[in-house]
Amino acid sequence: YDFSRIAEKHTTSGAIYFVIYKKHGTVVADTPFFSQVSEGISQGCKKNDYRLKISYIYEDEDTITKQIEEIQYSDCAGIILLGTEMEAGDLKPFLNLPIPVVLLDAYFETVPCNCVLINNVQGAYLAARHLIRSCKTQPGYLRSAYQISNFAERSSGFYKAIRASGMSSSRSIVHSLTPSMEGAYADMLEVIKNGEELASCYFADNDLIAVGAIKALKDSGYRIPQDIGIVGFDNLPLGSVIEPALTTIHVPKQYMGEAAAQKLIDLLNTPGQPPTKTEVSTMLVKRGTV
């Protein structure tokens, strides 16, 4: 038996680093979303006999360069970079590295790089269209008070559906809420307490905002969905256990992670490819909040 074949299979040099970039940590928290993405990356690495190491980078000018250098002079063969909280300028030091980098969960028009992300525009469009068809009225928007590229794209998909239905973008009622359950709950209570005008249905930038807002509305005597309908985004496990269960946009999270790992391994095997952008489509999950 030719044992050299076994040896060959395991000679992948170095590890793949999943680098989680934390700017303010309000969006990249330890939610099931990110654990499922990590699971996908882990599966993708296993399939190709690469070891996976996870590294956190916290935004702080002085230490970023040092942190990136540490990765560069380690056993790192390539990086999957979680760009959820990043801005275009934050990418530069990573792209100067002599190893391949795949950006996950973000995309910037100004930076040519390989990236894998959610089709946010399509997801938000589906959500808004569902609200318009079901509620026969103009949906409001529960937007994140912290802006990241994902939310900007969701905003664009939401307004695209509004315009496609012949409605005016400027007429949608918008509330800015903290993108966490507790934060959105407190902010929405404030909106209600201040007597601000409420829409009869809303699209929320993510499930955490949706669930926090639903709790605030219910605690203030509103019935969901009879008085106010809501659609979230992410399809977190939490959405199926609240009452009523949350209508939301499903994102194939594990697949995103696997696709990013596969892309990085392709770049390691065949360097010099032109950068590509991979968008993973979403799906409307109809439950009880509309």
Give residue spans per PLM region:
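Nucleotide donor/acceptor-binding cores
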Residues: T12-I16, A128-I132, K136-P139, S200, ...
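Residue-level detector of anion-binding/catalytic polar loops
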Residues: R51, P100, T137, S168, ...
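Alpha-helical recognition/docking segments in bacterial nutrient-uptake
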Residues: T11-R129, I192-E197, L208
